[in-house]
């Protein structure tokens, strides 16, 4: 893994900083674990935009990831590491003795030829998956389940990790990078280690077109629109919008509370927004 700054042979190349990964597989993904994927471009079943500034982008195929890690006690061998266009982390193709192959999220320290296993008696080693009750305190973990058997939902993006802070009865207490501390049932599974591609946030795309390849469209200011498109739109010449900042639907922005339920979960001990 290395950061490479391109030579300014054109305005679009001048500010590009790439993260180079020579260890990644250069061929096609494993076909039986690939599905076609249709973009909905942030439209709902009525065709209305639910999230602005999405659309276009390069065609992607979805890689089926094993988030449950339910092959108990069977040691698998990592055949290769791969790029996945659907997530910031890298993925690893694991071959099991029965001939089955599965994709998993690749943590730091797992490479071609590494052995990974899932189960209560699995050693504490990057890539292995255990119930939280079998992981020692202070361990760095990722791919954390919220409900037993549902599959990992937390800490899955590049460079992410959490720490097992304590165990209290049937619960384990997890400390997130965001500052949030929460309780999770101790029978839920988690994987050891930190997610790969930790330099993902250091890259620079360099030009607007690189954003478009990823399905991100321009962010247009409300005051630059027409009155039909935004409450701040219209006016002769440049205007300030003429009112307090609002969203396209007229809701006050910049700190206005829209959530009705004040408490998100009784499992959260320390909120990530509290200083």
Curated annotation (Swiss-Prot):
InterPro entries: NA-bd_OB-fold, Rib_uL2_dom2, Ribosomal_uL2, Ribosomal_uL2_bac/org-type, Ribosomal_uL2_C, Ribosomal_uL2_CS, Ribosomal_uL2_dom3, Ribosomal_uL2_RNA-bd_dom
Top-level lineage group: Bacteria
GO CC aspect terms: large ribosomal subunit
Record field: compositional bias (Basic residues): 209-219, 254-263
GO process terms (BP): cytoplasmic translation
This protein's UniProt keywords: Ribonucleoprotein, Ribosomal protein, RNA-binding, rRNA-binding
Cited SUPFAM superfamilies: Nucleic acid-binding proteins, Translation proteins SH3-like domain
Region (Disordered): 208-275
One family name in Pfam for this protein: Ribosomal_L2
GO molecular-function terms, A-Z: rRNA binding; structural constituent of ribosome; transferase activity
NCBIfam families for the chain: rplB_bact
Family (UniProt): Belongs to the universal ribosomal protein uL2 family.
Function according to Swiss-Prot or TrEMBL: One of the primary rRNA binding proteins. Required for association of the 30S and 50S subunits to form the 70S ribosome, for tRNA binding and peptide bond formation. It has been suggested to have peptidyltransferase activity; this is somewhat controversial. Makes several contacts with the 16S rRNA in the 70S ribosome.
Assembly, per entry: Part of the 50S ribosomal subunit. Forms a bridge to the 30S subunit in the 70S ribosome.
Stated name of the protein: Large ribosomal subunit protein uL2
Gene: rplB
